[in-house]
From Swiss-Prot:
PANTHER family: 3-ISOPROPYLMALATE DEHYDRATASE, HOMOACONITASE, MITOCHONDRIAL-RELATED
Pathway connected to this protein: Amino-acid biosynthesis; L-leucine biosynthesis; L-leucine from 3-methyl-2-oxobutanoate: step 2/4
Organism of origin: Marinobacter nauticus (strain ATCC 700491 / DSM 11845 / VT8) (Marinobacter aquaeolei)
Stated name of the protein: 3-isopropylmalate dehydratase large subunit
Residues involved in [4Fe-4S] cluster binding: 351, 412, 415
Cofactor: [4Fe-4S] cluster
Comment on bound cofactor: Binds 1 [4Fe-4S] cluster per subunit.
HAMAP family referenced in this protein's UniProt entry, alphabetically: LeuC_type1 (MF_01026)
Signal peptide: none
GO terms classed as biological process: L-leucine biosynthetic process
E.C. number(s) listed in UniProt: 4.2.1.33
SUPFAM superfamilies: Aconitase iron-sulfur domain (SSF53732)
Self-association and partners: Heterodimer of LeuC and LeuD.
Catalytic activity line of the entry: (2R,3S)-3-isopropylmalate = (2S)-2-isopropylmalate
Length: 472
C-alpha cells in the first residue's frame, strides 16, 4: 500500500464518518471567530435554542473593522456605525455564550490569523476553521486549516463537526536556497505567477523543498496564507524542529508529559517517502527575485527586474483581454519597467505580513533613511497587540517613526476597504497584503503586492526598487 501524504494523515485523523455521496463528516479541533462572519451564526444558535458544543474550542477577536488609531477610546473610537455594531455584537455574543474573546482593548487582540499561532491556539495536527478564506495560514504548522462560510460557522459551534469533501493532493516543491532579500512572500507570489490563481483549485497544497524548510514559521505562514490566492483552500507545511520550537511555551501549548506526547505525534506529521501526489510543481528557489504584482490578480506578477507585459505578445485572446483591462485599471503602459512605477502610499501589515519578523525586515531597510517626499502616506500596522509590544521593546517603532512612517495599532487595516484605512481613486499602493483585485483597498485603488522589505524600499524611494540594492 502506498504511503500517505500529510493531508491524507490529517484527514484520516479527523474523519468521523465517510458518506455514500462522497462527502464526509470531519471533527474540528479549533474555531477562530471574528466580527464579520460570526453574527448570523450566533443568531442561528439563539433561534434554535442551542449552545456551543465545545466552548473552549473557540477563540474570538475583532480585526476587520477595528480602527488602527485612537484605540484608547475602544469601541467608541469606531466612527462607522456598521463597523461599530459588528464589534459590539461580537462582544455581546461572546459574553452570552461564554466564548473567550480578546476584545479591542486587550493587548492580545489582533488579526485572527496572527493571534492563533502566537497564543499556541494553533497546534500541529489540528483541524482549524474560521469564517475567513485566509485560514489556510495555520497550515504552516502541519494543520488541516481552511476558511468556511457563516452557516458552517454555526454548524461548528453547534456540533464541532463539518461536512466536507476530500480534496486531491498537490506538492509544490521549491528547490535550492533563496537569495538575500528574497522572502516567503516572494516565493508564494512566484508560485502563483507560475500556476495561476486557479492552479490549486480542488487541491490541498503541501509546500516542500529546501527553500521552504529554510524559512521561519513567519515565512511559512505567509506562504500558506496565500494558498487561497493560488486557488487552494488548504495549504500546509510538514512539521519539523522549526515548528516545534515556535510552539513551545506558548499560552495554549501543552505542558509537561502532555508536551512530550504531543511532540512524539507531531513528528509523524509529514508525507511518507512513498506517498503519491496527484500533481507536483517544482520551482528553483535560487532563481526567484523579489516579486511585484502589476495587475488586478495575484497571478499578474513579475520579478522586480522585469517589466509590465505587452498584451500584443499574448496569443491567448482571453488572457490578452485580461492584460488590457488590468493595464487600463492600473494606469500602466505595456513594457513599462516595474522600477518606473511611482507610488502614492505604502502599507505594511495584514494577516500575510504583520508578524515580528516582517516588521524587522522592513525596519532594517528604512533605518537611517526617510520616507520619500512624493508619498502621501506610509504606514506600519502590527498584526497584534503582542507583536506591537515586542516591536516597541526592540525599538522598531522608533526606526519607523524617525523614517516618517506611521506606527499604528493592530487590525486588518488597509488590506481591505472595510475600515477607515483606504486608498483614494487612482492611488498606487505598495502593499504587503494578499489581494489586488479592483477596489480591494478602496474604490479605484491600485494595489501592488510585495514583501515587507520591498514595501519598505518603495517607501524610501517613492517607486519600486530592487531591495537588494539598498541592502548592499
Amino acid at each position: 500500500m502506498a504511503g500517505k501524504t500529510l493531508y491524507d494523515k490529517l484527514w484520516d485523523d479527523h474523519l468521523v464518518k465517510q458518506r455514500d455521496d462522497g462527502s464526509a463528516l470531519i471533527y474540528i479541533d479549533r474555531q477562530l471567530l471574528h466580527e464579520v462572519t460570526s453574527p448570523q451564526a450566533f443568531e442561528g444558535l439563539r433561534l434554535a435554542g442551542r449552545k456551543p458544543w465545545r466552548i473552549d474550542a473557540n477563540i474570538a477577536t475583532p480585526d476587520h473593522n477595528v480602527p488602527t488609531t485612537d484605540r484608547d477610546k475602544g469601541i467608541d473610537g469606531i466612527v462607522d456605525p456598521v463597523s461599530r455594531t459588528q464589534v459590539e455584537t461580537l462582544d455581546k455574543n461572546c459574553d452570552e455564550f461564554g466564548i473567550l474573546e480578546f476584545k479591542i482593548k486587550d493587548q492580545r487582540q489582533g488579526i485572527v490569523h496572527v493571534i492563533g499561532p502566537e497564543q499556541g491556539a494553533t497546534l500541529p495536527g489540528m483541524s482549524i476553521v474560521c469564517g475567513d478564506s485566509h485560514t489556510s495560514t495555520h497550515g504552516a504548522f502541519g494543520c488541516l486549516a481552511h476558511g468556511i462560510g457563516t452557516s458552517e460557522v454555526e454548524h461548528v459551534l453547534a456540533t464541532q463537526c463539518l461536512v466536507q469533501k476530500k480534496m486531491k493532493n498537490m506538492l509544490v516543491k521549491v528547490n535550492g536556497k533563496l537569495g538575500a532579500g528574497v522572502t516567503g512572500k516572494d516565493v508564494v507570489l512566484a508560485i502563483i505567477g507560475k500556476i495561476g490563481t486557479a492552479g490549486g483549485t480542488g487541491y490541498a497544497i503541501e509546500f516542500g523543498g529546501e527553500a521552504i524548510r529554510g524559512l521561519s514559521m513567519e515565512g511559512r505562514m505567509t506562504i500558506c496564507n496565500m494558498s487561497i490566492e493560488a486557488g487552494a483552500r488548504v495549504g500546509m507545511v510538514a512539521v519539523d524542529d522549526t515548528t516545534i520550537e515556535y510552539v513551545k511555551g506558548r499560552p495554549f501549548s501543552p505542558k509537561g508529559e502532555t508536551w512530550d506526547k504531543a511532540v512524539e505525534y507531531w513528528r509523524t506529521l509529514h508525507s511518507d517517502d512513498d506517498a503519491v501526489f496527484d500533481k507536483v510543481v517544482e520551482l528553483d528557489g535560487s532563481a526567484i527575485q523579489p516579486q511585484v504584482s502589476w495587475g488586478t490578480s495575484p497571478e499578474m506578477v513579475v520579478g522586480v527586474e522585469g517589466a509590465v507585459p505587452d498584451p500584443a505578445k499574448e496569443e491567448d485572446p482571453i488572457k490578452r483581454e485580461g492584460i488590457v483591462r488590468a493595464l487600463k485599471y492600473m494606469g500602466l503602459q505595456p513594457n513599462q519597467k516595474i522600477t518606473d512605477i511611482k507610488l502614492d502610499r505604502v502599507f505594511i501589515g495584514s494577516c500575510t505580513n504583520s508578524r515580528i519578523e516582517d516588521l524587522r525586515e522592513a525596519a532594517a531597510v528604512v533605518k537611517g533613511r526617510k520616507v520619500a517626499a512624493s508619498l502621501k502616506q506610509a504606514m506600519v500596522v502590527p498584526g497584534s497587540g503582542l507583536v506591537k509590544a515586542q516591536a516597541e521593546q526592540e525599538g522598531l517603532d522608533k526606526v519607523f517613526i524617525e523614517a516618517g512612517l506611521e506606527w499604528r495599532d493592530p487590525g486588518c487595516s488597509m488590506c481591505l476597504a472595510m475600515n477607515a484605512d483606504k486608498l483614494g481613486q487612482g492611488e498606487h499602493c505598495a502593499s504587503t497584503s494578499n489581494r489586488n483585485f479592483e477596489g480591494r483597498q478602496g474604490f479605484g485603488g491600485r494595489t501592488h503586492l510585495v514583501s515587507p522589505a520591498m514595501a519598505a524600499a518603495a517607501a524610501v524611494t517613492g517607486h519600486f526598487v530592487d531591495v537588494r540594492e539598498l541592502m548592499n
